[in-house]
Amino acid sequence: MPRTSKAAGSVALVTGANRGIGLGFVAELAARGARKIYAGVRDPGDVSDQFKELPVEVVPLDVTDRALVQAAAAGCPDVNLLVNNAGLFTNHRLVLTDDPDAARREMEVNYFGVLNMTRAFAPVLGANGGGYIANVLSVAGAFPAPFMGGYSPAKAAALFLSSITRSELAEQGTEVIALIVGSVDTRMAAHVQGRKEDPRDIARAGLTALDRGEYVADTDFMAIEARARYARDPVRYERGMIKLLKATVMDTGR
């Protein structure tokens, strides 16, 4: 970690902050000396002692509700570090699905939610010297993931959003990083098999990459390995996905 982290003395807002990666970011920001952390949560009643002894102020926030997002921006005028972490994964396929609205819900949270927050807080960040935006994305958005129906396209859209935001906000001095996350030990990924990373480690890797001035950063071993494997031979990867999908249909009937 650089001698002085960009998180030190910062005023941060983290969406989806009461569990998983979001909670990991809250803890890591506090450890790096953040002055204040706004914890954006959909239901403040869902908060118990997660933030005990941390410099946290809970903010009611649903990233799909533009009125709430604007209220958060108005009520948090000192933010200079925004962590867009809130996410939704429904575990449905994109085309052959029994829930045709699942993909729309995933796009609303994982793409439009990030866009809503970025639009609302861009003026706040600009007024506070430029600041930083960290978008918590997924390896499923770095290449097509057929097992993650609407989630994969939504995260891919958010990856492009990150790049465009970086260009648009460059003049006001806002730095933007896209964090490519693999498999993490969270409630949202409870169904995923295999090795999973600790959410705090993801936050630590993400903030370290922000300190280094990176634009896009893999936060864990799975993200690094999967992206490299796809880059080596995307056709072979896609054929492998087709075989796995066929096996899944035979095993589950879906």
Q: What function would you assign to each model-found segment?
A:
Residues 18-19:
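Conserved glycine-rich cofactor-binding loop
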Residues 60-71, 100:
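The beta1-alpha1 cofactor-binding region of Rossmann-like NAD(H)/NADP(H)-dependent oxidoreductases
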Residues 89-104, 147-150:
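Conserved mid-core segment of classical short-chain dehydrogenase/reductases
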Residues 118, 154:
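Active-site helix of classical SDR
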Residues 138:
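Residue(s) in the substrate-gating loop at a strand-loop-helix junction
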Residues 144-152, 164:
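Active-site loop-to-helix junction immediately N-terminal to the catalytic Tyr of the SDR YXXXK motif
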Residues 178-179, 186, 190-232:
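C-terminal helical subdomain
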